Amino acid sequence: MLRRTVSNFAMSPYMLFISDLAKTGKLKGIRTPGKFVGKKYRQLSAKEKAALQQRAKQASTPAMTAYRRMAHREMSNKSVPIEQRRANLTKKWNETKQAQRAKAQKAQKKPKSAKSKVKKAAKKAKKSKK
């Protein structure tokens, strides 16, 4: 279970290649970026692919390091059976992901316009003049 989950977080050489192309701006204005990236990736030499694979092995994502830290902490409790430790780890990780998603969605919401606040302030000012 853990091996499969951690591998899902790992960065692949292809994903690194995509991020490199995106950073350089070569994907801007292309109608089918997936097709373009696939073609470019297949054209890479063996040396370039090996360099990408090396970088991918060294790359880590914040989610991967957070999961490893949590897994180490949860699995170190030897007084609890291994099945229960795994269940606890899965439960806590899912709760963490849900909290992060909620936080991200909250951050993406557009702020309310100041129009209503301006109207309220104008009404208060109008009432105070009377």
From Swiss-Prot:
Propeptide: 1-10
Domain of life of the native organism: Eukaryota
Annotated segments matching region Disordered: 95-130
Transmembrane segments: none
Location(s), subcellular: Mitochondrion matrix, Kinetoplast
Residue ranges of coiled coil: none
Recorded GO MF terms: DNA binding
GO CC aspect terms: kinetoplast
Keyword tags: DNA-binding, Kinetoplast, Mitochondrion
Compositional bias (Basic residues): 103-130
Function: Histone H1-like DNA-binding protein involved in the organization and segregation of kinetoplast DNA (kDNA). The mitochondrial DNA of kinetoplastid protozoa consists of about 5,000 minicircles and 20 to 30 maxicircles. These circular DNAs are held together by catenation into a highly organized compact disk structure referred to as a kinetoplast DNA (kDNA) network. Binds preferentially to a specific fragment of minicircle DNA and is able to compact kDNA networks through DNA charge neutralization and condensation.
Family per record: Belongs to the KAP family.
Subunit structure: Associates with the kinetoplast DNA network.
Identification of the protein by name: kinetoplast-associated protein 2-2
Species in which this protein is naturally found: Crithidia fasciculata
